From Swiss-Prot:
Pfam families, per database record: Seryl_tRNA_N, tRNA-synt_2b
Protein localization: Cytoplasm
Phylogenetic placement of the source organism: Bacteria, Pseudomonadati, Aquificota, Aquificia, Aquificales
Domain of life: Bacteria
Protein name: Serine--tRNA ligase
Species annotation: Sulfurihydrogenibium sp. (strain YO3AOP1)
Domain commentary: Consists of two distinct domains, a catalytic core and a N-terminal extension that is involved in tRNA binding.
Subunit annotation: Homodimer. The tRNA molecule binds across the dimer.
Pathway info: Aminoacyl-tRNA biosynthesis; selenocysteinyl-tRNA(Sec) biosynthesis; L-seryl-tRNA(Sec) from L-serine and tRNA(Sec): step 1/1
């Protein structure tokens, strides 16, 4: 959630930054400022009327004791009560409109984020490794998986519908091995605390990280219950400290968790229909950092390096891309994508997205810390995939494939199988 104080004091700055995402936000900001002004006037009027009512209520017993007529005061007190009630009803309507706009406004892009409309305007930062040159026509992961009988898309569809898969034998074991490998690297080498969290959360938890209300259509809701399946462990890990005030000496906090993730993939019709690249249910190891504001951008660079480490150990080529303003997620101030090389597509595909949300999520989730002087400040939160497990499986199957249609296991994983 953007800082209302910043919006009031420097609306041009807010509009300038949001314009780099989409010009349509400018009208929303103008309307938000209008409502805010109206809201503050009503609040001031209510406070003034309450003060008057309190003064007249104090006079009432004095006049009564003196035997004076109190009819006029009684009528005025009653009138004030009715006026306040009407103003409070009006204020509630205005508050609802204010929040309905505020909750849909994304984070302000950081100044060094490239300005652009979509993924075509993203900026490549670096590459690691060289794509393998095959002396045969490389197969796709789903061709390899079907031929080996380890990926079964028909049975996945029979059980659950489209974009679901059943894994057998080597695929199932490799999925499990990758999860354990990723968690071990992040906990033993990068200092993260491993966490196990629920996969079902309350709506206010999804509000805290920015999925609700804007992305309601991409979430799975439990019928007749006010619970949602998580689209990422970012939701649960970040909200571990919702409505809390942390001590400065307890920061930074690094959390990692493996969870299944659930997404309707609204708007993805026709994209990546074959294979396991885009599923309604998928496994992911998530990384979340809760840090002091002055540390957050250094922590973002570290976060990207920590996610990269997994691919380096697996010896799979990838590149790091800085997302432009038009391609960034709703809550992000700055995002790097890590894209892994997929031989069958002859291109890089996203396997991790690492973001600094600054205090955007912290404001929504009310996560603060107390400094040495006793003052409270919002933390900065960061999140990233470390990594998407299914996409890592794809990358291994394709980059390590052999002419006979099988594939090798990366050296670093052999102790996990």
């Amino acid at each position: 959630m953007i800082d209302i104080k910043l919006l009031r004091e420097n609306p041009d700055f807010v509009k300038e930054r949001l314009k780099t995402r989409d010009e349509s936000y400018l009208k929303l900001i103008d309307r938000l400022l209008e409502i805010d002004e109206e809201r503050r006037k009503i609040i001031k009027e209510i406070e003034s009327l309450r003060a008057e009512r309190n003064e007249k209520s104090k006079l009432f017993p004095i006049l009564k004791k003196e035997g004076k007529d109190t009819t006029e005061i009684q009528q005025r007190v009653k009138q004030i009560g009715e006026i306040i009630k009407n103003l409070e009803d009006k204020l509630q309507e205005i508050e609802n409109e204010f929040n309905n706009i505020l909750y849909y406004i994304p984070n302000l892009p950081a100044p060094d984020v490239p300005i652009g409309k979509d993924e075509n305007d993203n900026v490549e930062i670096r590459r690691w490794g060289k794509p393998r040159k095959f002396d045969f026509e490389p197969l796709s992961h789903y061709e390899i998986g079907e031929r080996l009988g380890i990926l079964d898309f028909e049975r996945g569809a029979k059980l659950s519908g489209s974009r679901f898969t059943v894994m057998f034998k080597e695929a199932a074991r490799l999925e499990r091995a990758l999860i354990n490998f990723m968690l071990d690297v992040h906990t033993k080498q990068h200092g993260y605390t491993e966490v196990w969290t629920p996969a079902l959360v309350k709506p206010e938890i999804l509000f805290g990280t920015g999925q609700l209300p804007k992305f309601k259509d991409d979430l799975y809701k439990i019928e007749d219950e006010d619970l949602y399946l998580i689209p990422t462990a970012e939701v649960t890990l970040t909200n571990l400290h919702a409505d809390e005030i942390l001590n400065e000496e307890d920061l930074p906090k690094y959390y990692t968790a493996y969870t299944p993730c659930f997404r309707k993939e609204a708007g993805s019709h026709g994209k990546d229909v074959k294979g396991i690249l885009r599923q309604h249910q998928f496994d992911k190891v998530e990384l979340v950092k809760i840090v002091k504001p002055e540390d957050s951008y250094n922590e973002l660079e570290k976060l990207v390096n920590e996610a990269e480490k997994i691919l380096q150990l697996l010896e799979i080529p990838y590149r790091v891309v800085l997302l432009c303003t038009g391609d960034m997620g709703f809550s992000a101030a700055k995002t790097y994508d890590i894209e892994v090389w997929i031989p069958s597509q002859n291109r890089y595909r996203e396997i991790s997205s690492c973001s600094n949300t600054e205090d955007f999520q912290a404001r929504r989730a009310k996560i603060r810390y107390k400094d040495k002087d006793g003052k409270n400040h919002y933390v900065h939160t960061l999140n990233g995939s470390g990594l998407a497990v299914g996409r890592t499986l794809i990358a291994i199957m394709e980059n390590y494939q052999k002419p006979d249609g099988t594939f090798e296991i990366p050296k670093v994983l052999k102790d996990y199988l």
